[in-house]
Regions:
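Structural signature of tandem-repeat unit edges
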Residues: 1-17, 32-46, 56-69, 79-92, ...
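Short amphipathic alpha-helical segments that mediate assembly, nucleic-acid/protein binding
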Residues: 19-22
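Consensus positions within tandem repeat domains that build extended binding/scaffold surfaces
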Residues: 49-51, 71-74, 94-97, 118-120, ...
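Short acidic-glycine loop/turn motifs at beta-strand connectors
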Residues: 148-151
């Protein structure tokens, strides 16, 4: 007699705690075709890091109430995953646990969850709804955003999010990979935009940063290829490395007079950027700050600048550069590969 196979919503259910166990089970089960549901063993307390990473044939995860922790990247890249039920035994969800699960459309966080890591749902391009139990003491949802209640930090956003006015910080990777996000209003309660907060939001075309913001984190808008304009107020004192790298649609950028350092890769690969006016608050242009801005023909370097890092303008189209006497250090190949320009390493004293 053939063994009866358990099903879930019409799919075969396979019990396994990681991808290796899943492969072994599939080898023994003739005729099983994806998609299928995976059931975690009822004796499992923690789903380990990378347990099912990139298992694209999994459509549903059945997690028992013995599980208290979902580890780092446990289900990252499970693009076929459309359904996951997190039981009320789970207290911790690790960094990038469901990263790039593009088939997920909604998530529900129960009242037991006390800690959610960075980028937990980053790159979930299909996500349109976020719900948190009203009884959860650590987190709440508002405007399709998941918010850490005590710190007022927006942890997870999605394509349909509206940032509430209670938020003071947009956390690391909060909107990363939300490719269907075309516009976002940042309220003037926000003081910090975290690392990779809007990275790879390719549908964003413009954004206005309120004058309450003092810091833009590393890679905050990296890879926002559709971004054509951005307004940065004078309140911003720090723009992190690679903050606007790969923003291939930007033609102009205003660097506020409050910034003292243009960090590494800040505007790298901004291929349509044609001119830059660097304010006299800037003292340092770090390595590869404007590398491969292939249409950059003009840059004004003020006499406040003392340092220009390695390959700062490498691969640009600069035809003339006025380097003031204030500059004491020019790094290796700082302007090399610009038409008509050649330069050896120079240290000015």
């Amino acid at each position: 007699m053939a063994k009866t196979i358990e099903t879930y919503e019409g799919m075969p259910v396979i019990e396994a705690n990681d991808s290796k166990a899943l492969e072994k089970k599939l080898e023994k089960m003739d005729g099983i075709k994806p998609p299928f549901a995976v059931k975690i063993s009822s004796r499992t307390k923690m789903i380990k890091e990378n347990a099912f990473s990139r298992c694209t044939d999994i459509a549903a995860i059945l997690i028992p109430d013995s599980v208290t922790e979902i580890g780092y990247q446990a289900f990252s890249g499970c693009t076929g995953l459309t359904s996951v039920c997190i039981p009320d035994s789970v207290t911790e969800i690790g960094d990038y646990a469901f990263k790039d699960c593009t088939g997920l459309t909604s998530i529900e966080i129960l009242d037991s969850v006390k800690e959610i890591g960075s980028g937990t749902f980053a790159g979930c391009t299909g996500l349109i709804a976020i719900c948190v139990s009203e009884a959860n003491p650590a987190y709440h949802s508002s405007g399709n955003c998941l918010i850490h209640t005590e710190s007022h930090t927006l942890i997870i956003g999605c394509n349909h999010s509206v940032i509430p006015s209670s938020v003071t910080e947009i956390g690391s990777s909060a909107f990363s990979g939300c490719t269907r996000l075309t516009s976002v209003f940042i309220p003037d309660s926000v003081t910090e935009i975290g690392r990779s907060a809007f990275s790879s939001c390719t549908g964003l075309t413009s954004i206005k940063i309120p004058d309450s913001v003092t810091e833009i984190g590393s890679g905050a808008f990296a890879g926002c290829t559709g971004l054509t304009s951005i307004e940065i107020p004078d309140s911003v004192k720090e723009i992190g490395s690679g903050a606007f790298s790969g923003c291939k649609g930007l033609t102009a950028i205003n660097i506020p007079n409050s910034v003292t350092v243009i960090e590494s890769y800040t505007f790298a690969n901004c291929e349509r950027l044609t001119s830059v006016d660097i304010p006299d608050s800037v003292t340092k242009i770090d390595s590869e700050a404007f590398v491969y801005c292939t249409e950059l023909t003009s840059v004004n370097i003020p006499d406040s600048v003392t340092y220009i890092g390695d390959e700062a303008f490498f691969g640009c189209k600069l035809t003339s550069v006025n380097i003031p006497d204030s500059v004491k250090y020019i790094g290796w190949q700082a302007i090399l590969d610009c038409p008509g320009k050649s330069q050896k390493r120079k240290i000015y004293k």
